Amino acid sequence: MLIFKDAFTDDELASDSFPMKLVDGLIWEFKGRQVVRREGEIQLAGANPSAEGEDGDEGSEECVERGIDFVLNHRLQEMNCYEDLVTFKSYCKSFMKKVVELMQKNGKSEAEISEFKRKIPAWVVSLLSKDRFKQLQFFIGERMAEGQGEGQVAVVEYRDEEDGEVPYLMLVKEALIEEKQ
């Protein structure tokens, strides 16, 4: 399994256990779903709890958590402060500068850096459109939530599909470290 970690805080933000695709060579999108499960239980996509010997209802004292599977699995924390347009724009400006510096440090070519600088503004602007922006949710990893660094803000958007509204997690590829587990 591949774990996608924030390059600045080392927070786990996603994994390849979710359907994923790379958009425009720039943004990883992870498809999630709403789940209800016992607190602390991590269920990987495609797992079948009944086939793994789990009992049904074991009592009423059990804590249940509800939410998006990738948010629960990676213990992401919702951050409402980024719902303010000015705050989010300011964050994006400083974060993208850090990403470019990271790309330079990691030995990316000038062509790769120029391509990133050319493409990323269009993605940010697409998020900022009024109708889209008010529908977004923003999450951060545990270390960033504890004040241990300033890293990537995970953007979640619900999209209408045949099955209803489906949550998608969007992360900037160049600000992630892929770690094999």
Curated annotation (Swiss-Prot):
All copies of domain TCTP, residue ranges: 1-181
Keywords of this entry: Calcium, Cytoplasm
PROSITE patterns named in the record: TCTP_1, TCTP_2, TCTP_3
GO molecular function: calcium ion binding
Compartment(s) of residence: Cytoplasm
InterPro entries: Mss4-like_sf, Mss4/transl-control_tumour, TCTP, Translation_control_tumour_CS, Translational_control_tumour_p
Membrane-crossing segments per the record: none
Domain of life (superkingdom): Eukaryota
PANTHER family recorded: TRANSLATIONALLY CONTROLLED TUMOR PROTEIN-RELATED, TRANSLATIONALLY-CONTROLLED TUMOR PROTEIN
Function: Involved in calcium binding and microtubule stabilization.
Protein name in UniProt: Translationally-controlled tumor protein homolog
